[in-house]
Amino acid sequence: MLAASIFRPTLLLCWLAAPWPTQPESLFHSRDRSDLEPSPLRQAKPIADLHAAQRFLSRYGWSGVWAAWGPSPEGPPETPKGAALAEAVRRFQRANALPASGELDAATLAAMNRPRCGVPDMRPPPPSAPPSPPGPPPRARSRRSPRAPLSLSRRGWQPRGYPDGGAAQAFSKRTLSWRLLGEALSSQLSVADQRRIVALAFRMWSEVTPLDFREDLAAPGAAVDIKLGFGRGRHLGCPRAFDGSGQEFAHAWRLGDIHFDDDEHFTPPTSDTGISLLKVAVHEIGHVLGLPHTYRTGSIMQPNYIPQEPAFELDWSDRKAIQKLYGSCEGSFDTAFDWIRKERNQYGEVMVRFSTYFFRNSWYWLYENRNNRTRYGDPIQILTGWPGIPTHNIDAFVHIWTWKRDERYFFQGNQYWRYDSDKDQALTEDEQGKSYPKLISEGFPGIPSPLDTAFYDRRQKLIYFFKESLVFAFDVNRNRVLNSYPKRITEVFPAVIPQNHPFRNIDSAYYSYAYNSIFFFKGNAYWKVVNDKDKQQNSWLPANGLFPKKFISEKWFDVCDVHISTLNM
């Protein structure tokens, strides 16, 4: 961030007058800085007295005085005193689940000394205005809210949101660029590790939002949306100095800048020591995207660093909070299906389990029905998870499951592949030694290709193949199309509400064991097929009728794309 050149003159004088920490240059010889020798770390001064506590409460928004974001031209920042101080302490104590005594006891000071993010927790209330004297009304003031700190540059130098209801701001575009500043790298991790960790942090947000994050090393700095860098004390032209190791470890600014305190001992996510750079980066990116702090247990947006969480993820509330700003992920699927497997429990009994999969382009997601979300870390490349089948644009999946048969097939173009569930790979040949893939016309006579989609109906022991506006019912026992087929999809699967129907070119159709129902997908919408239970409750419903369409994102959550550069993370 190159905002120093446009600081207000008074602020610049305050900055230059402040003591500048002198640090020896961190020595390295390798291009990637893997042999870098970090300079000694500075320690933050503990909060141990009344004055330090007052500064803390003001700095992080707990008092009614805004003094958090850089020196003030009018002199040193005010601090809460007397009754105002006691009330600020009580607010802080309540948020930290401490007895709200209003006294600076040992437990309260300990909470203030915990490592934390530098973004304020609360937006202070506006100062009380004195009564207006009689006379003409005052001239209109600036439209900037009196609650907001002074804007020191085009980037606004203010945090993104507050738990007291202040309006959070969000990016207006969906593709965001980021860059780790080459002049502000960590002295403790290799460049490769830093870039990998930061890219993973962006990916974690991309997995739950329609945002696409891409690393940009070529554009001019001013064109990059989110810039990240490490620094100590006064750093990167920033008006807010870092305090050394032990307290404030990072801060984020509106519209995209994130700074990490290089005096902190940042470590990779696999380490059980230090502060996880991944966890801090995910937190700060949350601020840049518009999320404030919360004291809710389990949230990545808690202001304090929570150790011993090596496998942390964005919880349900964090996901819903960010989706409130950017919306849910929408999109079509090439195919969707439930994968059935047999397992033995602790008593040796055979149990049938299932997992739901969604395929799109060259990626796939496993959907955890019990948690109502995609698996952490998805999507994954089809090439990685399904050896031997086409690596993109799967047309259909069919699982023929009877007392005598347990066969799984993938379809693409004019061919199909059989998949071996036990070996977890596509078969290369059948029992007679004939090679896979095979032509659809040979294995399923009478079925056209390429297909739109297909599914196996266990009730009737039929495969329904869909092609444009037609559906073909295929008898798996006789290996032929039923005599009365093909028929129009609207004839076999009529609309419950007239004209509320996909009509043709269905993207995917599958039977869900989680809902005991058949679903048709087209675009970002789905139609549920009337099942036996529906008919029992409402006998007037047509057999195999389609209920009115709904959005896929309202039933299956967080099936989100990520940038292709992060697919293998």
Curated annotation (Swiss-Prot):
Tissues of expression: Identified in fetal brain, kidney and liver. In adult tissues found primarily in ovary, kidney, liver, lung, placenta, brain and peripheral blood leukocytes. Expressed as well in various cancer cell lines.
Database matches in PROSITE patterns: HEMOPEXIN_2 (PS51642), ZINC_PROTEASE (PS00142)
Native organism taxonomy: Eukaryota, Metazoa, Chordata, Craniata, Vertebrata
Protein name: Matrix metalloproteinase-21
Disease implicated: Heterotaxy, visceral, 7, autosomal: A form of visceral heterotaxy, a complex disorder due to disruption of the normal left-right asymmetry of the thoracoabdominal organs. Visceral heterotaxy or situs ambiguus results in randomization of the placement of visceral organs, including the heart, lungs, liver, spleen, and stomach. The organs are oriented randomly with respect to the left-right axis and with respect to one another. It can be associated with a variety of congenital defects including cardiac malformations. HTX7 inheritance is autosomal recessive.
Primary localisation category: secreted
Record propeptide residues: 25-144
UniProt KW keywords: Calcium, Cleavage on pair of basic residues, Disulfide bond, Glycoprotein, Heterotaxy, Hydrolase, Metal-binding, Metalloprotease, Protease, Repeat, Secreted, Signal, Zinc, Zymogen
Principal EC category: hydrolase
CDD domains the record matches: HX, ZnMc_MMP
Top-rank taxon: Eukaryota
Extent of the Hemopexin repeats: 330-389, 391-447, 448-496, 503-559
Region span, Disordered: 115-166
Species of origin: Homo sapiens
Catalytic machinery residues: 284
Ranges of compositional bias, category Low complexity: 147-156
Entries under Gene3D superfamilies matching the protein: Collagenase (Catalytic Domain) (3.40.390.10), Hemopexin-like domain (2.110.10.10)
Post-translational modification note: The precursor is cleaved by a furin endopeptidase.
